[in-house]
Amino acid sequence: NISIDDIIKSISSDYRLVHRLDKDTSGLLIVAKNLYTAKIFGKLFKSSLIQKTYIALCEGQPKQKESDVLLDIKNKKDKIEKTKTHYKLLAVQNNISLIQYKPLTGKTHQLRIVSKKLGCSIIGDNKYNSHSKFNNEELKLNAFNLKFIFKDKNYEFFSELSKDFNDFLKKYKFKDLKRYTLVKF
C-alpha cells in the first residue's frame, strides 16, 4: 500500500502533509514545502482559521435542511472528543441527498459518523453503512473547498470531483454542482 505521505516524500523529503483525509475520501490536501510552513499551517488548523467544506452524496435525507451537529466521538484511544459540524442539504433526488458539510472540528471519521447520526449515511461508506445497496460504490465524500488567509492574502481552492462522483450525480439526475449555493460563514 502506498500512502499520500509516501508519494509526497518521493517528490521531496522536505515536503510535509499538513492534515489528513479519511481513507477513500477524495479532494484537497495542503502540503507544505518545509517543516516551518507545516507548523504554521498546523497552528492555523488548530485555531480553526482554515475553513474546510466537503460535499457528500448520502442515502436518505436529514430531517432538517440545515443545522449544526454536536457529537461526542470516541477516538482511537477510546477517549471522547467533542465535535461540531455544520451541514446544509443542497438537493435530493430519488432519496439520495447532496449535502455540504463544514466540520468546525477535525476528528477521524467525523463526517461519516455525523451522516449516520442524521440517518443518511454517505454512499460507499462500508464502515458506517454496511447494509447499503450502494456498497460497491466508491465513497462519495469529497474535500471540496479550502479557505484561509496566509501572509495577509486570502486563498480559496476548489476540488474537481472524481469521474465516479460526477457519473453518480448524472445517473441520479443532479444538476451541475456549480448551481448549488455553498454555505457562507
Tell me the role of every PLM-derived stretch.
Residues N1-F185:
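RNA pseudouridine synthases
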